[in-house]
From Swiss-Prot:
<keyword id="KW-0843">Virulence</keyword>
<dbReference type="GO" id="GO:0050525">
    <property type="term" value="F:cutinase activity"/>
</dbReference>
<comment type="function">
    <text>Catalyzes the hydrolysis of complex carboxylic polyesters found in the cell wall of plants. Degrades cutin, a macromolecule that forms the structure of the plant cuticle. Allows pathogenic fungi to penetrate through the cuticular barrier into the host plant during the initial stage of fungal infection.</text>
</comment>
<dbReference type="Pfam" id="PF01083">
    <property type="entry name" value="Cutinase"/>
</dbReference>
<feature type="signal peptide">
    <location>
        <begin position="1"/>
        <end position="18"/>
    </location>
</feature>
<feature type="active site" description="Nucleophile">
    <location>
        <position position="118"/>
    </location>
</feature>
<dbReference type="InterPro" id="IPR000675">
    <property type="entry name" value="Cutinase/axe"/>
</dbReference>
<keyword id="KW-0378">Hydrolase</keyword>
<feature type="site" description="Transition state stabilizer">
    <location>
        <position position="119"/>
    </location>
</feature>
<keyword id="KW-0719">Serine esterase</keyword>
<dbReference type="InterPro" id="IPR043580">
    <property type="entry name" value="CUTINASE_1"/>
</dbReference>
<keyword id="KW-0732">Signal</keyword>
<feature type="disulfide bond">
    <location>
        <begin position="32"/>
        <end position="107"/>
    </location>
</feature>
<keyword id="KW-1015">Disulfide bond</keyword>
<feature type="active site" description="Proton donor/acceptor">
    <location>
        <position position="183"/>
    </location>
</feature>
<dbReference type="InterPro" id="IPR011150">
    <property type="entry name" value="Cutinase_monf"/>
</dbReference>
<dbReference type="GO" id="GO:0005576">
    <property type="term" value="C:extracellular region"/>
</dbReference>
Length: 203
């Protein structure tokens, strides 16, 4: 119960900060585009794409791919501390897998990016393991910021399509559960990550 209360407090703080900064923490774009990003936010982040890495990543992709070329669908899931401690929310993992499968079926010509931050990275790992190899072969790139599973391969994914961004000394990337300042600075890696995803899309 205390863990849940803490998570709710952090989510409220994150949404207040996002509002102050004018950052949109929710994205639902089912329409097909040249690039389709399926993104899972981190634990206790607001909205469905969060604040600390997703929005800046999407903005950088839009610059590189062109106006209107990028569509983003955030994964709706609890993003609770309990889910993180489970290795990634099971329902959220299944939801992400379902969104990716549906996107592959409905937008066969799109360049699909699976991405997540922190617990969202766990969802990327879990969803990839749930999806058939034929579906994963159609994924253009996979980008994870602050991966709790850092160093573990993503199931059914070509390693050349994978980019994992982890800062030195980042407690979460080291397999622990203490959130320090390194965990909150992944927006600075947006351009590097977007450059990778855009290059993969154009390969």
């Amino acid at each position: 119960m205390k863990v849940t209360a803490l998570g709710n407090t952090l989510t409220g703080f994150g949404q207040a900060l996002a509002t102050t900064l004018g950052v949109d923490t929710t994205s639902s774009s089912p329409n097909c585009a040249e690039m389709m990003v399926v993104f899972a936010r981190g634990t206790s982040e607001p909205g469905n794409v969060g604040l600390f890495s997703g929005p800046t990543f999407f903005d950088a992709l839009e610059v590189m791919m062109g106006a209107g070329a990028v569509s983003v669908q955030g994964v709706e899931y609890g993003a609770s501390i309990e889910g993180f401690l489970q290795g990634g929310d099971p329902a959220g993992s299944a939801a992400m897998a379902g969104i990716v499968e549906g996107t592959v079926q409905n937008c066969p010509n799109a360049k699909i990016v699976m991405s997540g931050y922190s617990q969202g990275g766990q969802l990327v790992h879990n969803a990839a393991a749930m999806l058939p190899a034929a579906t994963m072969a159609k994924i253009s790139s996979l980008v994870i910021f602050g991966d709790p599973n850092d160093g573990k391969p993503i199931a059914n994914a070509d390693p050349s399509k994978v980019m994992v961004v982890c800062h030195p000394g980042h407690n979460i990337c080291d397999g622990r559960d203490l959130v320090l300042v390194e965990h909150l600075t992944y927006s600075r890696d947006a351009v590097e990550a977007a450059t990778f995803a855009a290059a993969r899309a154009k390969a």
